[in-house]
Amino acid sequence: MARLLLWIFLPLFVLSTYVWANDETKDQDRLQECGTVAKEILNVPDDIPQDLLDKADCVIVFPSVRKAAFGVGASYGRGAMTCRQGEHFNGNWGAPTMMALEGASFGFQIGAQATDFVLLVMNDHGANSILGDKVKLGADASAAAGPKGRDASAETDVTARAEILSYSRARGVFAGVSLEGSTVRPDNDANKQIYGRQVPAKEIALHGAEHVPPAAEALISTLDARTPKHASNQTTTTDTGGGL
């Protein structure tokens, strides 16, 4: 009887172990892809304006978002979000938390099979909203297509007030794109695969609960090189001319 049970449960155990390891590998690969996409997009000076990137509290990268196999026009993507550490978001870029993006067929109007998205989270309310639960862009957090190029100073009031600025790249074409109506949420299962334990997304992204995993080093190093300091928190010393 014991031998029979062994023959029944041993294959199931081996299969479950394989599935778990395979999922972990996929999540590691996705983190590495986030780093590749970030490097390709952020290292082009005329794409995302430097002043906006410097003001961003967090950055989210969704690589290769595709049309879902279900639903008319539905799309689904998975990626990673990293935030500047510290109470005022003025520290180093921290360990990423895995995220999921769900919505309509955004970005596919030009016939692309897959679209890369980069989202800038511009304030702490936007960051806390996204990390806390499932957020509908445009309703739970204000969102707008991000301005492109060196002339970002000409951005509209809508863009200036937005908590989330979004950009897309498909077939080599880069542009600001509105993701209003889509949802963003923490991917808790993927976080467990990456970090080996169940830990809230907010603890990872905002409170330094985890170290940067090797698969995320390219993403973090790209951001460190492109925007190492939070511009709005830099202090300057001025000469007050304190003569006698």
Where would I find each of the regions flagged by the language model?
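Positively charged n-region of N-terminal signal peptides that target proteins for export
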Residues: 1-6
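Small-residue-enriched, tightly packed secondary-structure blocks
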Residues: 22-244
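Bacterial Sec-dependent signal peptides at the C-terminal "C-region" and cleavage site
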Residues: 16-22
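Bacterial N-terminal signal peptides
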Residues: 7-16
